[in-house]
Amino acid sequence: MATDTQKETLGFQTEVKQLLHLMIHSLYSNKEIFLRELISNASDAVDKLRFESVANADLLAEDPNLRVRIEFDKDTNTVVIDDNGVGMSREEAITNLGTIAKSGTSAFLEQLSGDQKKDSQLIGQFGVGFYSAFIVADKVTVETRRAGVAADQAVRWVSDGSGEFTIENIEKDSRGTRIILHLKAGEKEFADNFRLRHLVTKYSDHISIPVEMEKPVYPEMDEEGNPKPVDENKAPEYEAVNSAKALWTRPRNEVTDEEYQEFYKHISHDYQEPLKWSHNKVEGKLEYSSLLYIPSKAPYDLWNRDMQRGLKLYVQRVFIMDEAEAFLPPYMRFVKGVVDSNDLSLNVSREILQNDHAVDSMRSALTKRVLDMLGKMAKNEPEDYQKFWDEFGNVIKEGPADDMGNKDKIAGLLRFSSTHTDAAAQTVSLADYIERMQEGQDKIYYIYAESHNTAKNSPHLEILRKKGFEVLLLSDRIDEWMMSSLQEFEGKSFQDVTKGKLDLADQENEEEKKEKEEKAEKMKPLLDRMKAVLNEKVAGVNSTDRLTNSPACLVVGEYDMGLQMRRLLEQAGQKLPESKPTLEVNPDHPIVAKMDSETDEERFADMAWLLFEQATLSEGGQLEDPATFVSRMNKLIVQLSK
């Protein structure tokens, strides 16, 4: 029966056009990856069919021997990648081959700079997949039939990569997908038996599905040593070119670094090498194998809530799902890898994974394995760990709140900038800080501000710098939230130097204590006058010894929300209970001394407001009425210039 072809021409999604153009130019120097990408996709399609066949064994009836097959033809300059996997319907072909169904695609494309080397790294992180075919081909034909449908429901998709594709219905005898690459004139090297076999063993040896090529036929010799005629009608025989054994099932000592690296590229579609990996087999009450990777670069969508994350899940070597999120906590969403369990059911679902005791045990063990891997890297390979931290540090900072059971381990992995060097780079561990603590010091001091410069130049640090106390400088948006989950580390409690009383009493002698108390008593009338002026904005005005150069600073209560966190939540539209800071003033500052003798109440009020507004600005805050601040400042300058 003739098939109604329903042939139509459609346009690529705008992002596909951009990606195709950039990819062809940026990845040309690494063009052989096209075969790895297409074999990887074919392997995934076979894995998906194997999974679907668990519930419907009839899907395998016509051809139970799952495989990927590579063919080539020197005369027509073509290479074919053929699989007998799950295949695609017409709608799936249009969606999968004509659009990029990834959230954040537009944002990713905006990151591309035109620098070929940088762009090639970004595109590699994004994952080129099927579109890599156009690096070596000027035309690509895809013939595909969904498993379980009739032969006349197959489709043919054709494009030259310029912006459009045609799609039509065809008849196809077998399920699965056949991709025909019509190679560019300069890419004939790939229509070669030896070249293709070499690429399969180089990039795809670890894939658990057999990757087959036609078995070479060597003519038999007659008694006189001449080749016998070859039967041209004999059906070709195929042989597996790869080892076709799941890499994670092999003993670690039998797997080379190159094989681990290529397997990472296969599962992550990232063609940069991983920073670290851990391969482990667990036997006993629970039996499972895991292979976990730490990427070398953060993905472009790391901060996208909808980013695909999680491990590839296999049950007894049968592929179950991608992005199984249940096996690692959200702050480890950058980890790639595979987990293969003998204890889960083949019909496991995402919902079941959320409520399974075996999964909970595996999650706990895998989380500790990742933390141990990072801990060893931090101890033994600090340069590599610093690279990791620079890429993923802000995600690890989610850990103390997410994972209370491993809070101490996570705290040991954190890195900060500090007054030890004042550099913005986050290189200081809490262990480093404790090692440099002064005798008698029992607190780890830190400050949080909206920028590194605001933090390191904060008036709150003045007395601490003078007395030689190191202070951690925090300026990432997540930092204040993270610190709210950290109470102590190795017996040392944390103190935000902008909150409550800065207790350096243990480091003061009796004479200093007495002098401070006398100053505070002498200052009381001035402080009361200032409080009367600023009553609507401050909870109180106190004398302080935490300042040495600045006239004033703002301090919140020990248990109150920090000013930066308060601003963030208010900007997000959250209603918060009213809370006023305390203004602390430096009794030794000339401005404060001048105010003490000021008899003009209007000028005194202007000076009090200016101190409050300067303190607000110095800790990164914004003024409610900048124009009035400028007016006050100008008025005082004029008065002083007379």
Swiss-Prot record:
Cleavable signal peptide: none
Location, primary (coarse class): cytoplasm
Gene3D superfamilies: 3.30.230.80, 3.40.50.11260, Heat shock protein 90, C-terminal domain, Histidine kinase-like ATPase, C-terminal domain
Region (B) residue spans: 351-567
A GO MF label: ATP-dependent protein folding chaperone
GO-annotated cellular components: cytoplasm
Entry's localization field: Cytoplasm
Coiled coil start-end: none
Region (C): 568-642
Region feature A, mapped onto this chain: 1-350
Statement: the UniProt record of this protein carries the keyword Cytoplasm: yes
UniProt-listed SUPFAM superfamilies: ATPase domain of HSP90 chaperone/DNA topoisomerase II/histidine kinase, HSP90 C-terminal domain, Ribosomal protein S5 domain 2-like
Keywords, ordered alphabetically: ATP-binding, Chaperone, Cytoplasm, Nucleotide-binding, Stress response
Subunit-structure text: Homodimer.
Homology family: Belongs to the heat shock protein 90 family.
Protein task: Molecular chaperone. Has ATPase activity.
Protein name: Chaperone protein HtpG
Organism: Marinomonas sp. (strain MWYL1)
Lineage, top ranks: Bacteria, Pseudomonadati, Pseudomonadota, Gammaproteobacteria, Oceanospirillales
